[in-house]
Curated annotation (Swiss-Prot):
Residues 1-10 form a transit peptide. The modification N6-succinyllysine is found at K124. This is D-2-hydroxyglutarate dehydrogenase, mitochondrial. It is an enzyme of class 1 (oxidoreductase). (R)-2-hydroxyglutarate binds at R409, T413, K424, N466, H499. Activated by zinc and cobalt ions. Catalyzes the oxidation of D-2-hydroxyglutarate (D-2-HG) to alpha-ketoglutarate. Also catalyzes the oxidation of other D-2-hydroxyacids, such as D-malate (D-MAL) and D-lactate (D-LAC). Exhibits high activities towards D-2-HG and D-MAL but a very weak activity towards D-LAC. It comes from the Eukaryota. Its main location: mitochondrion. Keywords: FAD, Flavoprotein, Metal-binding, Mitochondrion, Oxidoreductase, Transit peptide, Zinc. The lineage of its organism: Eukaryota, Metazoa, Chordata, Craniata, Vertebrata. It is found in: Mitochondrion.
């Protein structure tokens, strides 16, 4: 028997399946109409009704540690021979961006510290340009004066790539936040690099489209930073990476040259595809100032299922069944272990809507036919329940319920940040070995680690491995590295699936790339930024 049709007369509905149901029971018998709110939550908004990412400055970091150690005091890094900003420099930059040269120490404190509060620079200057020409003038001046520049968007990165290491000038794109054009037939959006991802999502959704990427940090991250790090996120399974959806870029090179490759064409087979050099380059080759991106049509029907699985083998089999049965409507398949759910409950007060399980999966479908999607989803759920792959679950289709269920996955990073110091690893691994490292590390680290958790994007083989401790520990770091990277290399995996390398991971690039590739990367850097002023100390290994 198929699942009941999902029709508008069911406002804010939630369906649950219980493991106590007998084998062979129909899907209808395994469902019940959910309550208006999940136990453990407040009113209709409460902990669920807000954006998943807590704005900068309002997370619990201040209650954990009032001061973050300066990066050079924690890491063995030496300042390169760049010039120091002088009063004459400040006067010259003030003429370029009048009233937008920030030197106040209080205003400079947040952009000097990363969101995870693990690295801290000592920049004395932040610039806020509004236009590409202002960025060009800034970089031209800094190139002539040999002043290092740290491009910065929403500063939501995980690897220290968006914060200065020493006293680099911070070039913020926060005021470059205008939509330049949108074509409502092709779905091509052209915008400045400082547009916040969530604001762009709202803009295109009002016009019947969606952004091809979605991140837990969408309330703060900038599209320019997303492109500069080739951010993956929650929709890669359906829409692919930004290397496929970004059509064109406008980039300012280190010497102030404006490279305008801001095409809106889906097909352009003329010469080298230069935009690919800057996608994922983390601001080391040029400053992205504008983006042309292809937005897919907004689905008229979205469903989210949150399911409990008895083991990781069942998670993999559920994914295999999901791809086979849901096919063209499958848009996301996320997984998380029980430790993740415990931390979300402990630090954020969010209740798990299903019975406790060793693993949980979140599945999103998106399509244009409510009846068609409901029928396919019903068949899938009946299959995984009857086969024992899934022991319990809940399903939502209205916007509020969907946000509630997604918050359980999207706010894991926030929960981890409240648990102590976090050692974060963003790995690509073969699916059948995706979770093995988590159990391996629990045995290896023992009580020296507070928590070892694993979650991520199963659809594209991306594991987010996180280890927490009360405070930073060199002995714990020594037990983790290089062991994690050697283990990953042994599986022919990648040491960075989507977060990039930034400052904290730059020296492990060799675990994923051969020496010949590293040499070519250095040559490209020297060609486009001969003085090395753009985001120094990032991405490329310190030593050749």
């Amino acid at each position: 028997m198929m699942m009941p049709r999902l029709v508008p007369r069911w406002p804010a509905w939630l369906f649950c399946w219980r493991a106590a149901c007998i084998q062979g029971a129909s899907v209808r018998q395994k469902m019940w109409a959910g309550p208006s709110k999940i136990p453990g939550l407040g009113g209709p908004r409460g902990a669920w009704g807000t954006s998943p990412l807590v704005p900068r400055g309002s997370c619990s970091a201040s209650s954990r540690t009032p001061e973050v150690t300066l990066t050079p005091e924690r890491y063995p890094v030496q300042r390169l021979p760049f010039s120091v900003v002088s009063e004459d420099d400040l006067a010259a930059l003030e003429r370029v961006v009048p009233g937008r040269v920030i030197t106040d120490p209080e205003e400079l404190e947040p952009p000097n510290v990363d969101w995870l509060r693990t690295v801290r620079g000592s920049s004395k200057v932040l610039l806020r340009p509004r236009t590409t020409q202002e960025v060009a003038h800034i970089l031209r001046y800094c190139h002539e004066r040999n002043l290092a520049v740290n491009p910065q968007g929403g500063n939501t990165g995980m690897v220290g790539g968006s914060t200065p290491v020493f006293d680099e000038i911070i070039l913020s794109t926060a005021l470059m936040n205008q939509v330049l054009s949108f074509h409502d037939v092709s779905g091509v959006l052209v915008c400045q690099a400082g547009c916040v991802l969530e604001a762009l999502s709202q803009y295109v959704e009002e016009r019947g489209f969606i952004m091809p990427l979605d991140l837990g940090a969408k309330g703060s991250c900038h599209i320019g930073g997303n492109v500069a790090t080739n951010a993956g996120g929650l929709r890669v399974l359906r829409y692919g990476s930004l290397r496929g959806t970004v059509l064109g870029l406008e980039v300012v090179l280190a010497d102030g040259t404006v490279l305008n490759c801001l095409t809106s064409l889906r097909k352009d087979n003329t010469g080298y595809d230069l935009k690919q050099l800057f996608i994922g380059s983390e601001g080391t080759l040029g400053v992205i100032t504008a983006v042309s991106i292809l937005c897919p049509p907004k689905p008229s029907t979205v469903n989210v299922a949150f399911l409990g699985c008895p083991g990781f083998a069942e998670v993999l089999q559920t994914f295999r069944t999901c791809r086979a049965m849901l096919g063209e409507i499958l848009s996301a398949f996320e997984f998380m272990d029980a430790e993740c759910m415990k931390l979300v409950r402990l630090h954020l007060g969010l209740s798990c809507p299903v019975q406790e399980s060793p693993f949980y999966v979140l599945i999103e479908t998106a399509g244009s036919g409510p009846g068609h999607d409901a029928e396919k989803l019903g068949c899938f759920l009946e299959q995984v329940l009857d086969s024992g792959l899934v022991t319990d679950g809940t399903l939502g289709s209205d916007e509020r319920r969907i946000k509630m269920l997604w918050a359980l996955r999207e706010r894991i990073t926030e929960a981890l940040s409240r648990d102590g110091y976090v050692y974060k690893y963003d790995l690509s691994l073969p699916l059948d070995r995706l979770y093995d490292l988590v159990g391996d590390l629990r045995a290896r680290l023992g009580p020296s680690a507070k928590h070892v958790v694993g979650y991520g994007h199963l659809g594209d083989g991306n594991l987010h491995l996180n280890v927490t401790s009360e405070a930073f520990s060199t002995s714990l770091l020594g037990a983790l590295e290089p062991y994690v990277y050697e283990w990953t290399a042994g599986q022919r995996g990648s040491v960075s699936a989507e977060h990039g390398l930034g400052f904290k991971k730059k020296d492990v690039l060799g675990y994923s790339k051969p020496p010949e590739a590293l040499q070519l990367m250095r040559q490209l850097k020297a060609l486009l930024d001969p003085k090395g002023i753009l985001n120094p100390y990032k991405m490329l290994p310190t030593h050749a």
